[in-house]
C-alpha cells in the first residue's frame, strides 16, 4: 500500500445526489484512491434537495449573485436537507463502495469559525479555518469525512454556507488539493467548449463578458482563492465523465485548471 500525505478534497454538487450511477462511480474511484493510501475528504452541497424541501413546505427559493438567500424560517429545512438527507445519501453510497466514512458538518470538532456573510443573504455564513484536529484524526484512520456545509456561530445559531466556499476553507485547513466536481466537465467558453486553464485575469475578463456567471462564478472564484492561497492549481471537473474520474485517481489533471 502506497502512502500519500496530501489530502484530496473532493467537492460534489447536489446534482450528484440525483444520479445513482454517478454516485457509485465516484465512490468506487474514491475507494480505489483510499486503498492506495490517498486521504480523501468529501464536501457536498444539496441544492436540488433543498429546493424540493422548500417547495414542499410552500417556501420560495431566492438567490442573490449565485448564493442562496436563507431567511430564518427556512434554516431548519435547509439544515435537514443538507446535514441530514444529502449527507446520509452520500454516506450510504460510500458504505456500498466499501468506504468507512464519517458524516459531519462544518460545526463538528471546532473545525471552522463562522459569522454572517451579508445581512441581505440572511443566515448565510462566511467560514474560516480553525482547528484541523478532528478532520486529521478521521483521515489518519483511513476513513473518509463527508462534510455538509452547515456551520454554527459561537452563540449556536446555524448558518448555511456555500459548499464551494466550505470546500475551499477545509482544503486550506488540511493543506489539501481541491477538486470541484459538478455536472459539467469544467469551465466552458461562450461556444460551450472546455477551457483547459484559467488565471485570475482571464476569469475577471470572462465574468465581465458574462461567460462565467451565477453558480459557476462562485465556484471559480472559490477555486481561485484557494489556488492563490496554496500556490497550486485547483481543478474544476465533472463527476459525470468516467475518463475524468480515472485520470483523477491516477493524479492526472482533469477539467479546467484554475491557476494561482
Curated annotation (Swiss-Prot):
It catalyses: N-acetyl-L-glutamate + ATP = N-acetyl-L-glutamyl 5-phosphate + ADP. One of its GO terms (biological process) is L-arginine biosynthetic process. Catalyzes the ATP-dependent phosphorylation of N-acetyl-L-glutamate. Belongs to the acetylglutamate kinase family. ArgB subfamily. This is Acetylglutamate kinase. SUPFAM superfamilies: Carbamate kinase-like. It is found in: Cytoplasm. The lineage of its organism: Bacteria, Pseudomonadati, Pseudomonadota, Gammaproteobacteria, Alteromonadales. Substrate binds at residues 46-47, 68, 160. One of its GO terms (cellular component) is cytoplasm. The keyword Amino-acid biosynthesis applies. Pathway: Amino-acid biosynthesis; L-arginine biosynthesis; N(2)-acetyl-L-ornithine from L-glutamate: step 2/4. One of its GO terms (molecular function) is acetylglutamate kinase activity.
Amino acid at each position: 500500500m502506497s502512502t500519500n500525505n496530501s489530502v484530496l478534497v473532493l467537492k460534489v454538487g447536489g446534482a450528484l445526489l440525483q444520479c445513482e450511477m454517478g454516485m457509485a462511480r465516484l465512490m468506487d474511484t474514491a475507494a480505489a484512491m483510499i486503498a492506495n493510501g490517498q486521504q480523501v475528504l468529501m464536501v457536498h452541497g444539496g441544492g436540488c434537495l433543498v429546493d424540493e424541501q422548500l417547495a414542499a413546505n410552500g417556501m420560495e427559493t431566492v438567490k442573490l449573485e449565485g448564493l442562496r438567500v436563507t431567511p430564518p424560517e427556512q434554516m431548519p429545512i435547509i439544515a435537514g436537507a443538507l446535514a441530514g438527507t444529502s449527507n446520509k445519501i452520500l454516506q450510504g453510497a460510500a458504505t456500498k463502495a466499501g468506504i468507512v466514512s464519517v458524516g459531519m458538518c462544518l460545526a463538528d470538532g471546532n473545525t471552522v469559525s463562522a459569522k454572517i456573510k451579508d445581512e441581505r443573504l440572511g443566515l448565510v455564513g462566511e467560514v474560516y479555518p480553525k482547528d484541523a484536529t478532528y478532520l486529521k484524526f478521521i483521515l489518519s484512520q483511513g476513513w473518509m469525512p463527508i462534510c455538509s456545509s452547515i456551520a454554527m456561530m459561537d452563540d449556536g445559531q446555524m448558518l448555511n454556507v456555500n459548499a464551494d466556499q466550505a470546500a475551499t476553507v477545509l482544503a486550506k485547513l488540511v493543506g489539501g488539493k481541491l477538486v470541484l466536481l459538478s455536472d459539467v466537465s469544467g469551465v466552458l467558453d461562450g461556444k460551450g467548449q472546455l477551457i483547459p486553464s484559467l488565471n485570475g485575469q482571464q476569469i475577471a475578463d470572462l465574468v465581465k463578458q458574462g461567460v462565467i456567471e451565477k453558480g459557476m462564478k462562485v465556484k471559480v472564484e472559490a477555486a481561485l482563492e484557494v489556488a492563490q492561497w496554496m500556490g497550486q492549481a485547483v481543478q474544476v471537473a465533472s463527476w459525470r465523465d468516467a475518463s475524468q474520474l480515472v485520470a483523477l485517481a491516477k493524479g492526472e489533471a482533469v477539467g479546467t485548471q484554475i491557476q494561482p
